């Protein structure tokens, strides 16, 4: 979503003369002006793709559901003390500008030319970063992939397909709740079949995704980006290899519901890297929590940094303070790591820190870190690269499934009252 910020016209400066509440979401509300603005964004995005633009009324239910989920995640972030500093925000804005082949100044000028507010754009990016960190803590961190799963995957036909084709896909999901009755499942199957029949007759996929799909990317036309066959539910791997670009798959049942995929592009697989740069690094991680906010966490990381600079032992302090369960008992030692397997902020600080020098405290989505580089080397890592690639595929697959389950869960557990005229009332 961030990369498309400029192109989608995501932030409007116009002030609505009248406003009203369209949904109560736990301790917050969603205003009609917010919904109307997001509807316009979606319509502009669809129009820029050359698709038929649905009327606002057709998009409102999807948009409102997206806003409700975003609001719930932002409230979670607030309760957990998750913050995005201005420095991090500036870096993210710079990345967005770079993706659009602009400097930050050119990006600001382009926003102004389109009648968009730079400050509003910054706040939207901030919100998306907070949501990303909430998901990291609530979903990604609890996903585990065993070494045996990796070995089994690499030995499987699906694992071997890792090295072959990639597919640029869009999807339409007709969701079924975990406890759905047989009648509800049958109704979803009938709806999915009806959509598939429309697509085979030439209906616009982007428009149907925006108005009918329950997938998180529905308002982006269902665009999933590039995926390996192994990252997809099993029914789709064989279909896509022999399917022409532009075609759609029949609906397939998955744990989350019935999915239809459209093949937008194909490309061949890439060869395995033979050599890999590795860094031997150790770190201390301090995480914010509901009882220790970001500022207090930063101060604690600074105190630990000062103690190491004053001669205290890094490993002993890591054992006492670090909240990385995978390395704390080893004195913070991460051993030899591939920089590309690390989050960008950690990777950047590590690359800029000379060997044997302690970094100043810095922040990532996990919390505040202090690191020390113990060594650098280049090694033949063909087998490790294959294992890491398999690990990433399995983790991404589990993440996609777990995220959808978690989003349904927080929606079901929240108090939500819909006040949009003509919409179904839902209060929990």
Curated annotation (Swiss-Prot):
EC number: 5.2.1.8
One cellular component (GO) term of this entry: outer membrane-bounded periplasmic space
Location, primary (coarse class): periplasm
Location(s), subcellular: Periplasm
Pfam families assigned: Rotamase, Rotamase_3, SurA_N
InterPro entries per the UniProt record, alphabetical: OMP_Chaperone_SurA (IPR050280), PPIase_dom_sf (IPR046357), PPIase_PpiC (IPR000297), PPIase_SurA (IPR023034), SurA_N (IPR015391), Trigger_fact/SurA_dom_sf (IPR027304)
Signal sequence, renumbered to the chain: 1-13
Gene3D superfamilies found in the cross-reference section: 3.10.50.40, Porin chaperone SurA, peptide-binding domain
Domain PpiC, first and last residues per copy: 164-265, 276-375
Positions of the UniProt region annotated as Disordered: 211-230
Record keyword Repeat present: yes
Ranges annotated as spanning the membrane: none
GO biological process, one term: Gram-negative-bacterium-type cell outer membrane assembly
Enzyme class, UniProt record, top EC level: isomerase
Disulfide bond annotation, renumbered to this chain: none
Catalytic activity: [protein]-peptidylproline (omega=180) = [protein]-peptidylproline (omega=0)
Keywords recorded for this protein, A-Z: Chaperone, Isomerase, Periplasm, Repeat, Rotamase, Signal
GO MF, one annotated term: peptidyl-prolyl cis-trans isomerase activity
Protein purpose: Chaperone involved in the correct folding and assembly of outer membrane proteins. Recognizes specific patterns of aromatic residues and the orientation of their side chains, which are found more frequently in integral outer membrane proteins. May act in both early periplasmic and late outer membrane-associated steps of protein maturation.
Record remark: domains: The PPIase activity resides only in the second parvulin domain. The N-terminal region and the C-terminal tail are necessary and sufficient for the chaperone activity of SurA. The PPIase activity is dispensable for SurA to function as a chaperone. The N-terminal region and the C-terminal tail are also required for porin recognition.
Designated name of the protein: Chaperone SurA
């Amino acid at each position: 979503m961030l990369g498309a910020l400029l192109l989608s016209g995501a932030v409007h400066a116009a002030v609505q003369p009248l406003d009203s509440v369209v949904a109560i979401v736990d301790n917050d509300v969603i205003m009609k002006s917010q919904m109307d603005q997001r509807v316009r964004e979606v319509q502009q995005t669809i129009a820029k793709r050359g698709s038929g633009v649905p009327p606002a009324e057709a998009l409102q239910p999807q948009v409102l559901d997206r806003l409700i989920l975003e609001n719930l995640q932002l409230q979670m972030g607030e309760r957990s003390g998750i913050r995005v500093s201005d420095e991090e925000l500036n870096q993210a804005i710079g990345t967005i500008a770079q993706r659009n082949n602009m400097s930050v100044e050119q990006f600001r000028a382009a926003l102004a030319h389109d009648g968009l507010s730079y400050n509003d754009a910054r706040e939207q990016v901030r919100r998306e970063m907070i949501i990303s960190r909430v998901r990291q803590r609530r979903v990604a961190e609890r996903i585990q992939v065993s070494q045996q799963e990796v070995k089994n995957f690499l030995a499987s036909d699906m694992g071997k397909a890792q090295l072959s084709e990639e597919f640029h896909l869009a999807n339409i999901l007709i969701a079924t709740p975990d406890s759905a009755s047989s009648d509800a499942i049958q109704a979803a199957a009938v709806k999915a079949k009806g959509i598939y029949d429309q697509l085979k007759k030439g209906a616009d996929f982007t428009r149907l995704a925006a108005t009918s799909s329950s997938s998180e990317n529905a308002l982006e036309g269902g665009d999933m980006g590039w995926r390996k066959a192994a990252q997809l539910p099993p029914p789709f791997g064989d279909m896509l290899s022999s399917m022409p670009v532009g075609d759609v798959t029949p609906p397939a049942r998955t744990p989350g519901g019935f999915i239809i995929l459209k093949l937008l592009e194909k490309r061949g697989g890439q060869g395995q890297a033979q050599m890999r740069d590795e860094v031997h690094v150790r770190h201390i991680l301090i995480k914010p929590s509901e009882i220790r906010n970001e500022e207090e966490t930063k101060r604690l990381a600074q105190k630990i940094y000062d103690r190491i600079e004053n001669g205290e032992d890094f490993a002993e302090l890591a054992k006492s303070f670090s909240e990385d369960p995978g390395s704390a008992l080893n004195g913070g030692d991460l051993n030899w790591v591939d920089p590309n397997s690390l989050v960008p902020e950690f990777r950047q600080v590590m690359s800029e820190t000379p060997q044997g020098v302690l970094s100043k405290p810095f922040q990532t989505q996990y919390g505040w870190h202090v690191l020390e580089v113990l060594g650098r080397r280049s090694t033949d890592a063909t087998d490790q690269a294959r294992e890491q690639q398999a690990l990433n595929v399995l983790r991404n697959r589990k993440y996609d499934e777990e995220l959808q389950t978690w989003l349904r869960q927080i929606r079901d557990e929240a108090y939500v009252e819909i006040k949009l005229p003509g919409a179904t009332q839902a209060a929990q």
